[in-house]
């Protein structure tokens, strides 16, 4: 059994050192003549990308947390996570896989002796994406000391986010076609220009994320990237995604629904798509299997098992067949998001641009991404959809949230940052007072294996509770 904990990885050199007095022949005996002593960067990069795609769309991060808490899906059986009834062990695999599998592999690529700076830059960019996911889910996290100390200190989220801005710029600057090809890249197939665009697009995302806390820094970065928009993801063909193949390397949603049937599309999402006469509805959801139900029906969030059962499992909509295909992609960044960021930046006066134009482009890009963009103008002309500057946050919030379907943790982050859409807790929530989760618990292993740094983190950030706001999640947003 593979133990995926950072401390095991970090203790290996200590264990090896302790046995250096043993006969050198022992090492020779234990060598596998058919094994690769130093895994190749191409293999490690492929593994890190595949594991990240599984992690991003998988069980503990997605089905039992972000997909429910952002109200894209709802539970109809085993409803505890949908009622926020989770424990400090619920997110251990999110933490462990993020650090000891994905980031560990990327560190190995970056630290390899291969004389190819592009490999190191791509690894740095993908590692930055992983750190961004981790800090947005947990808050303060080990960052600057990770893999350098057995018990790494936690960096404040502010320092993590600003550190990632710098790392991504450094990586983008070092990517050059003359540095060599990048094999094993399952996202952009070694295309250096695409990786530069992805790096700068991530910087744009982070800049907006910190805008409520450090407006000067955020505004400068957003304005600079707006002036150099050609350096960003500029079409759906440039989206960052990972295309799965077939079993056993298949899309996690397809895998889950092949053996279980305890999730449905949320009533929150389906009702909003109906309100908007949204052509993405038959892409996002299926008609219920009960032939007597002729319209799409969502499941309510936050119900007890008995309450959920009373809705009728076969009277509710499963996720759309597009998302349940073996080879459905994991999507990490889209052209739609770029446009919504600039729409918000224009509405807030950060850039001198037409917020309505970027809002419309964001919606159109999402419709086209899912193959239903032919009647975009008609959709945009509806009173319920047409841009209203006095309601910019609400409108951008809803449309961006819809476009994030399949990117649950990103939707969860943006909802906390922007304050829209206005989601409501279900009747069986264990949090009380209508509260909603705003972060993940730290894994229980942090308390036992890295206790002093864990305590320092919660002393700085606040209690290790689901309702504790992270640094970027300002309470009084004044939208």
Where are these regions (language model features)?
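Structured, solvent-exposed acidic/aromatic patches
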Residues: 38-42, 73-372, 389-393, 478
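Bacterial N-terminal signal peptides that target proteins for export
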Residues: 1-10
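Long, intrinsically disordered, low-complexity segments
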Residues: 250-277, 281-285, 292-297, 382-479
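Bacterial Sec-type N-terminal signal peptides, specifically the leucine/valine-rich hydrophobic h-region
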Residues: 16-19
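Membrane-proximal, proline-rich intrinsically disordered regions
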Residues: 22-72, 76-77, 82-85, 89, ...
């Amino acid at each position: 059994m593979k133990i995926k904990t950072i401390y095991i990885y970090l203790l290996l050199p200590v264990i090896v050192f302790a046995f250096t007095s043993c006969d050198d022949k022992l090492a020779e005996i234990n060598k596998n003549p058919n094994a690769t002593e130093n895994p190749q960067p191409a293999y490690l990069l492929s593994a890190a990308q595949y594991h990240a795609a599984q992690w991003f769309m998988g069980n503990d991060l997605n089905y039992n947390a972000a997909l429910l808490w952002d109200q894209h899906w709802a539970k109809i059986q085993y409803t505890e996570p949908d009622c926020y009834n989770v424990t400090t062990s619920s997110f251990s695999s999110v933490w462990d896989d993020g650090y000891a599998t994905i980031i560990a592999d990327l560190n190995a690529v970056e630290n390899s002796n291969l004389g190819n700076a592009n490999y190191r830059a791509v690894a740095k960019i993908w590692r930055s994406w992983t750190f961004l996911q981790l800090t947005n889910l947990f808050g303060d996290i080990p960052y600057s000391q990770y893999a350098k100390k057995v018990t790494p200190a936690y960096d404040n989220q502010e320092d993590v986010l600003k550190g990632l801005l710098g790392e991504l710029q450094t990586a983008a600057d070092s990517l050059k076609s003359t540095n060599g090809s990048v094999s094993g890249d399952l996202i952009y197939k070694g295309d250096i220009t695409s990786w530069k665009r992805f790096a700068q697009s991530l910087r744009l995302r982070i800049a907006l994320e910190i805008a409520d806390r450090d407006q000067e820094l955020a505004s400068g970065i957003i304005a600079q990237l707006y002036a150099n928009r050609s350096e960003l993801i500029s079409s759906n063909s440039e989206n960052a995604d990972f295309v799965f193949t077939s079993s056993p390397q298949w899309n996690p949603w397809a895998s889950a629904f092949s053996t279980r049937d305890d999730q449905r599309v949320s009533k929150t999402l389906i009702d909003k798509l109906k309100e908007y006469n949204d052509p993405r509805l038959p892409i996002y959801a299926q008609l219920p299997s009960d032939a007597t139900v002729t319209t799409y029906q969502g499941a309510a969030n936050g119900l007890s098992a008995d309450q959920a059962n009373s809705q009728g499992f076969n009277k509710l909509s499963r996720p759309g067949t597009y998302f349940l295909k073996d080879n459905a992609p994991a999507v990490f960044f889209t052209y739609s998001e770029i446009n919504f960021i600039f729409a918000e930046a224009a509405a807030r006066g950060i850039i001198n641009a037409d917020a309505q134009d970027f809002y419309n482009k964001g919606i159109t890009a999402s419709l086209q991404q899912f193959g239903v963009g032919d009647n975009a103008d008609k959709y945009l002309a509806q009173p319920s959809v047409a841009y209203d500057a006095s309601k910019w946050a609400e409108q951008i919030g809803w449309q961006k949230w819809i476009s994030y379907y399949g990117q649950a943790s990103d939707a969860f982050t943006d909802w906390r940052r922007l304050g829209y859409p206005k989601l409501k807790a279900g009747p069986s929530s264990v949090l009380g007072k209508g509260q909603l989760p705003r972060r993940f618990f730290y894994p229980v292993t942090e308390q036992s294996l890295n206790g002093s740094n864990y305590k320092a983190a919660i002393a700085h950030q606040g209690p290790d509770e689901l309702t504790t706001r992270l640094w970027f999640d300002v309470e009084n947003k004044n939208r």
